[in-house]
Regions:
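N-terminal lobe of the biotin/lipoate ligase/transferase fold
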Residues: 1-103, 128, 176
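Long, positively charged amphipathic alpha-helical accessory segments at protein N-termini or as interdomain linkers
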Residues: 1-2, 19, 95-112, 122-239
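Short loop/edge segments at beta-strand edges and connector loops
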Residues: 28, 114-116
Length: 239
């Protein structure tokens, strides 16, 4: 695979937004882009600040699972948000980002869908993980950090995950410019986020989301920390 330059400048050049990703921080290696964003928040980083790393030494996913991928072939990034809505609405931003990633990947010509609630999948295998974390101060949101990991040009998936995960390269045989994909994700996210804050629900994105839902009318298992349960994915509604 040819190596496409990947740094602050090459990423910034692909981001055509008003605020999402307009400030980019890039590191060859970091503990976690989410933790980095939290540190940037304490330094008064602005809404929409984007932290991108080539490698994470302490990346994590949902339910506290460790998340590590080889450097050079994936996207590892986190965006810092400073919303003024109530904390109870913040968790829905995970779905907003999931939709945004799926829309961006679709724009590359890939047949992509969303496995409820927010797994972005190609050929029914996961290509993306999203972790949303919130910091509070005096009962109000200080920051929301959304971490995104996308398997872009990975040529191999570790053996124990081959039936569950894949990459854009493995599914299409094509290599993709990570700078371009980050720019597409930021553009989609900015538009979707601005829809979300109008109503603090997903009502303005329901049709877009349900159209991309992979497991509609299929059984799903919800891995709640306290009480896992099963059900049928019918799509999303306003709540």
């Amino acid at each position: 695979m040819s190596v496409i330059p990947y740094n602050t400048d090459t990423i910034s050049n692909e981001i055509q937004t008003e605020w999402a990703g307009k400030t980019v921080h890039f590191a060859k290696e970091i503990d976690s882009t989410n933790e980095w964003c939290k540190r940037l928040s304490k330094e008064d980083a602005v809404h929409g600040t984007l932290a991108v790393a080539e490698f994470q030494s302490a990346g994590k996913g949902r339910l506290g699972r460790r998340w590590v991928v080889p450097e050079g072939n994936s996207i590892m990034m986190s965006i810092l948000l400073r919303p003024d809505f109530e904390p109870r609405f913040a968790s829905m931003l995970t779905l907003v980002m999931g939709l945004s990633v799926a829309q961006a990947v679709k724009e590359l010509g890939v047949d992509v869908s969303i496995k409820w609630p927010n797994d972005v999948v190609v050929s029914r295998k996961k290509i993306c993980g999203i972790l949303t974390e919130m910091g509070l101060e005096d009962g109000k949101i200080r920051e929301v950090v959304i971490g995104v990991g996308i398997n872009v040009n990975l040529a191999e998936i570790q053996e124990d995950l081959k039936d569950k995960a894949t990459s854009l390269y493995l599914e299409t045989g094509k290599t993709y410019d990570r700078n371009l994909l980050i720019g597409l994700v930021m553009g989609k996210f900015e538009k979707n986020y601005e829809k979300f804050v109008q109503t603090c629900d997903l009502s303005l994105m329901i049709d877009d989301y349900n159209m991309m839902l992979a497991n509609k009318c299929q059984p799903v298992r919800i891995l709640d920390k306290l009480d896992p349960y099963e059900g049928v994915a019918l799509g999303i509604d306003r709540e």
